[in-house]
Amino acid sequence: MSYDMDITKTPPAHEPERQYYYMAKAKDFVEKKSKEIGRPMTYFVKTFGCQMNARDSEKLVGILEQIGYVEGTDEHSDFIVYNTCTVRENANNKVYGRLGYLQNYKKKNPLMKIALCGCMMQEPEVVENIKKHYKFVDIVFGTHNIFKFAEILCNNIESGSQVIDIWKDTNQIVEDLPVKRKFSFKSGVNIMFGCNNFCSYCIVPYVRGRERSREPKDIIREIEKLVADGVCEIMLLGQNVNSYGKTLDNPITFAELLREVNKIKGLKRIRFMTSHPKDLSEDLIMAIKECDKVCKHMHLPLQSGSSRVLKEMNRHYDKEKYLDEVKRLREQIPDIAITTDIIVGFPGETEEDFLETMDVVKQVRYDSAFTFIYSKRTGTRAATMENQVPDDVVKDRFDRLLKEVQTISSEKAKCYEGKVVPVLAEEMDDQKDGYVTGRMDNNSIVHFPGTEDMIGNIYNVKLDECRGFYYMGEIKEDA
């Protein structure tokens, strides 16, 4: 897409042409300001939350760099963007805490612009709070119109006042906008947006909107471009990738998409997340088994092992169905790594319910698990439930669960000692000079001797020693 657009004319009506018009307009502003101050204008993007947010931030950075900003090192930069998360209350508090510092920085730098975007901004009470107490924030937008970032910025530049642009929902997907990847050798790729599951504790459907899938041809085209640019590993992203394709005019399944992506020449690894247990089909299991580029790792959120609690959570499966799915996975792919999410302290959770969760943990023997204390989110059904579990009881259960998960994870990790496995070198080890940090097919971390020029390549590494949740190893030969 060309940036040679006449910004004196009326902006185009269609996307993405309209956004390229506003990028050109914003670039004109940035170039003039840079000349005035005698240096490039800088940006700093802080990402809170999940892989979806991380990918959104790469899009924001792509737009910022296209309009002339250069990357700064911290929050003293000229343009600060907080891409926020609201899955747990603590995430909101982190943002509010940092805004206080930004206000002081802005007093010292009148050119500074502050933008807040992401899931937290989809909550009406948050936006009202910002309007009342954080008037120094320049731009506020949500999850549905990130593609309009340049246009919203231009509105702020022209008006000189706070611009708030929040969409309640959308079915729009805008392709072909700039993206600046964090890593040269791996990339996330959105295959869908939104969620239709409405788990009773979860705010995601309210802030990310209804489920909508990208066209497979657009996904394949994006991955082919990434591979041509040196990417060897991609992560297919969605709130529930297992339900991919249902909203398309010509529906296809996630298993079918995996098989198509697996055919792309030059691509070496395919990961995906997140999978909802209710949509785990036999066809998907077979696709994971048969596609040689698909990593043998499944993140399968349990949330609770109690069928009663799962019903209250609106998860659409019970303990027996979940265990059956794990059994089917391991029958077809014996060496698959299974990881999970577990919530402790959901309203009404009894000791018996908790012990059901512990039972699933002991039966499944997860490679690792993300364990969370239930966080009440305004607007969800669970927030109004009675029988909130006392904090001391929740903490006791959380500690017991964490101990069990860590014990099992450590035991499972020990089984790989002495084996030679392919490892993708990802970055220099920040704890040990002369070592690189890489990742196995099953997502485990390995540290081994290496240099910076090895990053982005896959090596066969002998796992000499397991140190809890990571390995020390040495290269045997190129993979």
Task: Identify what each model region corresponds to.
Residues M1, T384-A479:
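Terminal RNA-binding accessory module
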Residues S2-Y244, D283, M298, E320-K327, ...:
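Proteins enriched for Cys/Gly/acidic motifs involved in redox and nucleic-acid/cofactor modification
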Residues C50, G245-G266, M313-H316, K376-T407:
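Radical SAM enzyme [4Fe-4S]-AdoMet core and its adjacent flexible, acidic
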Residues K113-L116, E123-E125, A228-E351, K362:
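Conserved SAM/AdoMet-binding glycine-rich loop
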Residues F147, N197, N242, K278, ...:
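Glycine-centered loop/turn positions within well-structured domains
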Residues K182-F185, C195-N197, V294, S304, ...:
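Short flexible coil/turn linkers enriched for glycine and charged/polar residues
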Residues C199, I219, L236, F272, ...:
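Conserved, mostly hydrophobic/aromatic
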Residues G238, T274, L302-S304, T340-V344, ...:
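Active-site proximal loops enriched in glycine and acidic residues that flank catalytic Cys/His/Asp
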